[in-house]
C-alpha cells in the first residue's frame, strides 16, 4: 500500500489533476450577455486540452522517473510498478504545461473582460511538496494599460480593496475636510440653547469698571436704562459725586444722612468745584441795589433747599401770588372802567379780545400738534386710559429741567458759596468709607446743633440735628441750640479709618492745633495739603506734603 506521503515524495514535481470548479462573476453588469453558456463551453475546452496533454506526457515522465530510480530497483520494484499503474490512473502533467495553459486562459479572460465579463476562482494546483494557490484577480478596465497583455506575470497579486475598506477610506479621507463642518454644525445646534449674552450678564465689577470711564452726565443717563444699570450707575455717582452749587450739595446731604447704603458708596468728596448762585463780570453791588435782575440769572442755594416747604420762599408760591395779583388788577380795572368814560371802557374789552385770541390760537396749535405728532396712540390704548381714568404722564427725562432758581427773598446770599458746618459733619459721620476729601476754597457758614430739650427730633441716621436742617425762621432759645465750630469738623474727620488724602487749601478757619491733631491722631492719613491756609500768611505748616514732612515741620 502507498500512503499519500510516499506518493508526494515520488512525484518529483509532477502535478496531480484534481476536480476543479469554475465560477464567473460580473463586476459591472454593463450589458446583458448569456455569459453562463459561453463560460461553460470555454471551461470544457480547457479541461479536454489538459487531459490530452497529460496522456502525451505520461510516457516521458515515466522514463525520467525510471532513470532517477535506478539505484532503488532492487528494493522497490513492486512499488514502482504499482506507482506507474497509479500514475496512469491519475493523469499527471508538468508545471510548464500548466503555465502555458494559464497563459492561454489569461488571454481568454482578457478577451472576455473586453466584452464586460470577468472570471474568478481558477483551479488550485499543489506544487511539489508545498501548496500554492494562484487566483487571477479581476481587474476593472478603467484605462488602456489594463487591456494590454503583460510580458511577465507577477507572483504578487494586485490588491483590490473590499467595499468595507473603501467606505473606511472615504471616512478617513473626508474626516479632515468635514471636521470643521462638524464642529460648526455642533456649535449651531447648541448655540440656540445658550443664553443671550448682554451687559446684564456681566459681573458687577466689570460693569463698574466700564461706567467709571464715563462722565457724570453719561452716568446719569444710565440711571434710566434698566435696574441693573441703575444700581451700577448709582454706585458710580455716589462714589465720586460732583456738585455745581450749594443747592445740589444740600440735596446730597439729605440723601446720605438718611440712607446708609448710599452713604457707604461715597469714597471721594470734592467741594472745591462749587460755584456761587450768581456770577457776573461786573460789580456785584447790583444785587444789593434796586437794579433789575432776571430771575433766571440767580441759582438756588442751600437755604432754598432748607426752606423748600415754606410757601413764602418757594417758586410755586411766587407764581401763585403773581397770578393772584394779575387777576386782582384785572378785576380792579374792570370795576373802574364801569364808572369811567367810553375811552377807558375799551381797555378791558381789548384785553378780553387778546385772551380769546390766545385761546383760539392755542386750540388751533393743539389740533395741529395732535394731527402731525410723530407717535400717535391707538384707539385701544386711549380707550383703556379712559376706563382707568388715569391721565397721560410723560416719563421723566434727565436734564429736562434746569437748575432751581433762588427765591427773591434770599437773593442777598446769591454771591456766596458758603456751606454750613453741620452739613459737612453730617457727610463725614454718615460716609465712613471716605478716602479723599477736598474742601479747598470753601467758606463755612456758622451753624448750631439742636439740643435735646427742643421740640425737634433728629431724623438722620447719625442722630445729629443742626439748625441748618430745620426750616425755622424765628429766633431759637439759648437752651435749644449749641454753637458748632470748624474744630468739631476736624474731630469728626479723626474718626475716618480709611482717610488718606485731605486738601484744605486757602481756608482761613484752619488752625495749627487742628493740623497737629490730624497729623498725630489719624493713622491712615498719608497726604495733607494746607497751601495758603490759616490766618497768618506764609505759615511754616501751610504747605502740601506727606504726613511725615508735616510732623517734622510742626516740631
From Swiss-Prot:
Listed name of the protein: F-box protein COS111
One Pfam family named in its UniProt record: F-box-like
Classification via InterPro entries: F-box-like_dom_sf, F-box_dom
Compositional bias (Low complexity): 32-42, 129-142, 327-346
Keyword Ribonucleoprotein: no
Key word Cell cycle present: no
UniProt region (Disordered), positions on chain: 31-82, 124-147, 327-354
Origin: domain of life: Eukaryota
Compositional bias segments (type: Polar residues): 48-61
Keyword field: Ubl conjugation pathway
Function: F-box protein probably involved in ubiquitin conjugation pathway.
Limits of the F-box domain: 196-246
Amino acid at each position: 500500500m502507498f500512503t499519500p506521503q510516499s506518493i508526494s515524495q515520488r512525484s518529483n514535481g509532477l502535478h496531480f489533476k484534481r476536480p476543479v470548479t469554475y465560477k464567473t462573476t460580473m463586476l459591472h453588469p454593463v450589458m446583458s450577455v448569456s455569459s453562463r453558456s459561453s463560460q461553460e463551453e470555454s471551461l470544457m475546452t480547457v479541461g479536454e486540452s489538459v487531459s490530452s496533454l497529460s496522456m502525451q506526457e505520461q510516457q516521458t515522465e515515466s522514463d525520467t522517473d525510471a532513470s532517477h530510480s535506478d539505484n532503488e530497483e532492487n528494493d522497490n520494484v513492486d512499488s514502482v510498478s504499482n506507482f506507474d499503474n497509479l500514475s496512469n490512473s491519475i493523469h499527471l502533467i508538468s508545471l510548464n504545461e500548466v503555465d502555458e495553459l494559464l497563459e492561454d486562459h489569461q488571454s481568454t479572460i482578457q478577451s472576455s473582460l473586453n466584452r464586460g465579463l470577468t472570471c474568478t476562482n481558477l483551479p488550485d494546483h499543489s506544487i511539489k511538496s508545498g501548496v500554492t494557490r494562484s487566483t487571477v484577480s479581476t481587474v476593472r478596465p478603467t484605462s488602456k494599460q489594463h487591456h494590454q497583455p503583460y510580458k511577465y506575470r507577477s507572483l504578487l497579486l494586485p490588491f483590490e480593496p473590499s467595499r468595507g475598506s473603501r467606505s473606511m477610506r472615504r471616512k478617513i479621507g473626508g474626516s479632515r475636510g468635514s471636521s470643521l463642518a462638524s464642529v460648526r454644525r455642533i456649535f449651531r445646534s447648541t448655540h440656540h440653547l445658550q443664553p443671550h449674552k448682554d451687559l446684564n450678564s456681566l459681573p458687577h465689577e466689570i460693569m463698574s469698571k466700564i461706567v467709571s470711564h464715563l462722565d457724570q452726565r453719561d452716568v446719569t443717563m444710565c440711571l434710566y436704562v434698566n435696574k441693573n444699570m441703575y444700581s451700577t450707575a448709582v454706585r458710580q455717582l455716589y462714589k465720586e459725586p460732583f456738585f455745581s452749587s450749594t443747592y445740589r450739595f444740600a440735596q446730597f446731604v439729605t440723601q446720605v444722612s438718611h440712607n446708609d447704603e448710599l452713604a457707604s458708596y461715597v469714597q471721594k468728596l470734592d467741594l472745591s468745584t462749587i460755584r456761587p448762585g450768581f456770577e457776573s463780570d461786573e460789580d456785584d453791588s447790583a444785587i444789593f441795589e434796586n437794579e433789575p435782575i432776571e430771575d433766571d440769572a440767580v441759582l438756588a442755594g442751600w437755604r432754598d433747599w432748607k426752606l423748600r416747604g415754606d410757601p413764602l420762599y418757594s417758586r410755586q408760591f411766587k407764581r401763585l401770588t403773581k397770578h393772584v395779583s394779575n387777576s386782582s388788577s384785572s378785576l380792579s380795572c374792570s370795576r373802574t372802567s364801569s364808572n369811567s368814560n367810553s375811552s377807558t371802557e375799551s381797555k378791558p374789552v381789548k384785553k378780553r379780545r387778546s385772551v380769546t385770541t390766545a385761546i383760539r390760537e392755542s386750540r388751533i396749535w393743539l389740533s395741529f400738534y395732535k394731527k402731525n405728532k410723530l407717535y400717535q396712540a391707538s384707539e385701544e390704548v386711549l380707550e383703556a386710559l379712559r376706563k382707568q381714568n388715569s391721565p397721560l404722564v410723560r416719563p421723566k427725562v434727565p436734564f429736562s429741567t434746569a437748575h432751581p432758581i433762588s427765591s427773591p427773598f434770599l437773593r442777598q446770599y446769591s454771591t456766596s458759596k458758603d456751606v454750613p458746618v453741620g452739613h459737612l459733619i453730617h457727610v463725614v459721620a454718615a460716609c465712613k468709607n471716605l478716602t479723599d476729601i477736598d474742601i479747598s476754597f470753601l467758606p463755612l457758614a456758622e451753624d448750631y446743633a439742636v439740643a435735646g430739650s427742643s421740640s425737634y427730633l433728629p431724623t438722620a441716621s447719625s442722630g445729629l440735628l443742626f439748625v441748618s436742617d430745620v426750616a425755622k425762621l424765628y429766633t431759637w432759645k439759648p437752651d435749644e441750640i449749641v454753637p458748632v465750630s470748624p474744630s468739631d469738623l476736624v474731630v469728626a474727620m479723626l474718626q475716618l479709618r480709611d482717610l488718606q488724602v485731605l486738601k484744605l487749601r486757602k481756608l482761613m478757619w484752619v488752625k495749627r492745633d487742628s493740623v497737629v491733631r490730624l497729623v498725630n491722631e489719624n493713622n491712615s492719613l498719608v497726604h495733607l495739603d494746607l497751601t495758603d491756609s490759616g490766618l497768618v500768611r506764609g505759615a511754616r505748616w501751610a504747605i502740601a506734603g506727606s504726613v511725615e514732612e508735616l510732623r517734622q515741620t510742626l516740631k
